[in-house]
């Protein structure tokens, strides 16, 4: 049985609220619009408020240099999340035999984020590698480990990290500044020891013909075909919930659900389309923004203390690629 033994997450240090982005940075769409259309109150950045105010992040390469000087990078966020996951699992870094990492906004082309995180945490030699499926990377990591279950070392550390604000355009007519936050999540996974969550195999797939619908150029800003991606995400997430429910014989109204933390409003659309109760839907986007692949696992880390043994969680996520994934977790 594959299980998650420890969960951790870490957010960047500098808070950006809606009033600051509208009144000082000058984003044209005001807080009322953000509340009704996105449902996001605040997010966190590896950058400084002064930098965003003065430059609008016109040159993402300058943002990367600033983040490095401030000591906050996708790797440092991932390492912070990893430390929390290791502590909850009650194991030492030296016991980890494999690190699998996702990083949507790497500051280094090479080496892998997995090796940089391993070095930061004091993890020894192993077949550490990056497995990137953008926002759906948590599902991809769980699927990969389920496929490899018999060959896994005793403890695996998975991390999902990104600093999207370094690739965000804060020009006045762009709403991306309201959406993105920086953060990371981590999970200690084992196929030999029971933990906090039982992991059932995930389903993952992609739509290559839509590969450029969500894109970050090597040294450019994030951009996407917003309306098309939103419509696809709502439709596909509903399909994925249904697929998992059918596979495992579940009534979706009796389980917990969690979706990609893209926006509060998008998740409401999904719940309304399927007639699912909001009280059994887990989310945190309103208080930290969209932190990409770390979104769902950070929700799990925050929600687990209020869940009880036997509770089941169906998760589904759609992201760049276009890539998607879904699966089932059970509280142990």
Could you tell me what each predicted segment is?
Residues 8, 102, 132, 156-162, ...:
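Short beta-strand segments
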Residues 1-72, 172-235, 239-242, 318, ...:
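Condensing-enzyme catalytic core mediating Claisen C-C bond formation in acyl metabolism
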Residues 30, 74-89, 232-248, 296-303:
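Short, well-ordered amphipathic alpha-helical segments that serve as non-catalytic structural scaffolds
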Residues 69, 222-285:
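A contiguous, well-structured pocket-lining segment that forms one wall/lid of small-molecule binding clefts
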Residues 79, 105-107, 119-124, 133-153, ...:
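Claisen-condensing/thiolase-fold acyl-transfer catalytic domains that form or cleave C-C bonds
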Residues 4, 52-58, 63-133, 247-267, ...:
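Conserved beta-ketoacyl condensing-enzyme motif
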Residues 152-181:
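Flexible, glycine-rich active-site loops centered on histidine and acidic residues
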């Amino acid at each position: 049985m594959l299980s998650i033994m420890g969960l951790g997450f870490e957010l960047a240090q500098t808070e950006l609220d809606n009033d600051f982005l509208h009144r000082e940075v000058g984003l044209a769409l005001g807080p009322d619009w953000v509340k009704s259309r996105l449902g996001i109150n605040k997010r966190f950045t590896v950058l400084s408020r002064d930098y965003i105010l003065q430059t609008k992040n016109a040159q993402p390469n300058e943002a990367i240099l600033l983040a490095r000087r401030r000591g906050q990078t996708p790797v440092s966020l991932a390492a912070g999340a990893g430390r929390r996951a290791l502590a909850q699992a009650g194991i030492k870094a030296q016991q980890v035999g494999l690190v699998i990492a996702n990083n949507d906004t790497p500051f280094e082309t090479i080496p892998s984020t997995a090796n940089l995180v391993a070095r930061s945490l004091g993890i020894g030699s192993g077949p550490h590698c990056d497995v990137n499926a953008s926002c759906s990377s948590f599902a991809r990591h769980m699927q990969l480990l389920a496929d490899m279950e018999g060959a896994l070392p005793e403890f695996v550390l998975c991390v999902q990290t990104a600093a999207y604000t370094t690739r965000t355009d804060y020009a006045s007519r762009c709403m991306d500044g309201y959406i993105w936050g920086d953060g990371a999540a981590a999970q200690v996974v084992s196929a030999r020891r029971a933990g906090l969550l039982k992991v059932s195999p995930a389903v993952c797939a992609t739509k290559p013909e839509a590969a450029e619908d969500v894109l970050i150029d090597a040294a450019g800003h994030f951009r996407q075909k917003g309306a098309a991606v939103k419509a696809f995400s709502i439709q596909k997430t509903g399909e994925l919930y249904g697929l998992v429910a059918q596979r495992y014989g579940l009534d979706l109204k009796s389980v917990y659900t969690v979706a990609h933390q893209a926006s509060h409003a998008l998740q409401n659309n999904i719940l309304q389309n399927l007639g699912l109760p909001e009280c059994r839907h887990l989310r945190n986007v309103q208080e930290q923004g969209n932190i990409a692949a770390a979104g769902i696992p950070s929700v799990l880390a925050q929600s687990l203390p209020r869940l009880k043994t036997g509770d089941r969680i169906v998760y589904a996520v759609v992201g760049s690629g276009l890539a998607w994934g879904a699966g089932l977790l059970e509280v142990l």
